[in-house]
Amino acid sequence: MRIAKVRGTVVSTYKEPSLQGVKFLVVQFLDEAGQALQEYEVAADMVGAGVDEWVLISRGSQARHVRDCQERPVDAAVIAIIDTVNVENRSVYDKREHS
């Protein structure tokens, strides 16, 4: 799993039928200090995340184990909206401070 920040949405009128009703987000991965990396991915949103929220991403075959992703061609899924991140006893992110 990786930490990312939601940067935007992807809208698709025509898609694989099993993806009907799935919301897609553009996410940018973050390093251990919370700094943005130049690495982006489109992920299926399973939790109702919004732009600028920090999220947890499940990727690869593990993404297909997420409920509602089974039997769907999904390589990345947003599986959690992050409240706090602490690294080495230091707060990197607190959602309450970014609301």
Curated annotation (Swiss-Prot):
What happens without the gene? An insertion in this gene leads to rod-shaped carboxysomes and an inability to grow in normal air, called a high-CO(2) requiring phenotype, HCR. When ccmL-ccmM-ccmN-ccmO are deleted no carboxysomes form, cells are HCR and RuBisCO is soluble. Both mutants grow on 2% CO(2).
Q: What biotechnological or industrial uses does this protein have?
A: Heterologous expression of 12 carboxysomal genes in E.coli (ccaA, ccmK2, ccmK3, ccmK4, ccmL, ccmM, ccmN, ccmO, ccmP, rbcL, rbcS, rbcX) leads to the formation of bodies that resemble carboxysomes, have densely packed paracrystalline arrays and RuBisCO activity. These structures open the door to generating carboxysomes in plant cells to increase their photosynthesis and productivity, as well as tailoring bacterial microcompartments to specific metabolic needs and molecule delivery.
Induction section of the entry: Carboxysome size and components vary with growth conditions. When grown in ambient air at medium light (50 uE meter(-2) second(-1)) there are 7.4 units of this protein per carboxysome, the numbers are stable under low light, and increase under high light and high CO(2) (at protein level).
Q: Which GO terms describe its cellular component?
A: carboxysome
| Compartment annotation | Carboxysome
GO biological process terms held by the UniProt record: carbon fixation; photosynthesis
**Residue ranges of domain BMV in the record:** 1-83
- Quaternary arrangement and interactors, per the entry? Homopentamer. Interacts with full-length CcmM.
Annotated family: Belongs to the CcmL/EutN family. CcmL subfamily.
Domain annotation text?
Answer: The tight homopentamer forms a pore with an opening of about 5 Angstroms in diameter which opens into a wider tunnel at the base of the truncated pyramid. The pore is positively charged.
What name is this protein filed under? Carboxysome shell vertex protein CcmL
- Tell me what organism the protein belongs to: Synechococcus elongatus (strain ATCC 33912 / PCC 7942 / FACHB-805) (Anacystis nidulans R2)
